[in-house]
Amino acid sequence: MITVNTLQKMKAAGEKIAMLTAYESSFAALMDDAGVEMLLVGDSLGMAVQGRKSTLPVSLRDMCYHTECVARGAKNAMIVSDLPFGAYQQSKEQAFAAAAELMAAGAHMVKLEGGVWMAETTEFLQMRGIPVCAHIGLTPQSVFAFGGYKVQGRGSKAQALLNDAKAHDDAGAAVVLMECVPAELAKKVTESVSCPTIGIGAGADCDGQVLVMHDMLGIFPGKTAKFVKNFMHGQSSIQAAVRAYVAEVKAKTFPAAEHIFAD
């Protein structure tokens, strides 16, 4: 079974980590069998599964239900579950109560969004036995504050994002996830923190990559984000597509130049 120690050893060895979102047991089992090391039960389910316009309406009850489903299908992969909007920002104690519910539902790690200001919560959780993935850069729960889905950390804002990563690393975060961050900055962050980094739209130099399942399978019609690749092209099955994703992450051929953001 993949553990926090496994991820640390992979970072040290330069072996890339493959992560995908999963929301139910059958896909979790398929991804697990295909060699995906980490399964993210993301609040992205609000958009991908529930058909909502953002992640904000997703409840803790929703997250626990889908975590239970994924846990029934996964045998080897690490399960990371999102703390949903409103379930952890009020206080460290509120965050612990919500995280404990997700862990009881089958999560091995919880993910929270936010920079330096959330590092205290990261420390509070990890000191109480709950591994934390700290999500920085573009944090979808703050999309309205950002004014849309925009690249974060460009120009003069680069140092602030680096500070966010270091604060969570110092607080004991098990993983730092960066979304929509210039590739060179993501590389600098990866080299500056002791914990593994996972990127989505953050270049090829992170310690691992993550995509939303529906994106990598080409399920969403119309225009997709720059960092998305449809791995179903040329494949005869979903499992083959997932294996292709894992292989390209491991070989460092995904993300390619067309999937990354410059400063």
Curated annotation (Swiss-Prot):
CDD domains the UniProt entry points to: KPHMT-like
Cofactor info, note text: Binds 1 Mg(2+) ion per subunit.
Enzyme Commission number(s) of this protein: 2.1.2.11
Residues reported in the UniProt entry to bind Mg(2+): 43, 82, 113
Annotated S-S bridges: none
Similarity remark: Belongs to the PanB family.
Job description of the protein: Catalyzes the reversible reaction in which hydroxymethyl group from 5,10-methylenetetrahydrofolate is transferred onto alpha-ketoisovalerate to form ketopantoate.
Name assigned to this protein: 3-methyl-2-oxobutanoate hydroxymethyltransferase
Species per Swiss-Prot/TrEMBL record: Neisseria meningitidis serogroup C / serotype 2a (strain ATCC 700532 / DSM 15464 / FAM18)
Gene (name only): panB
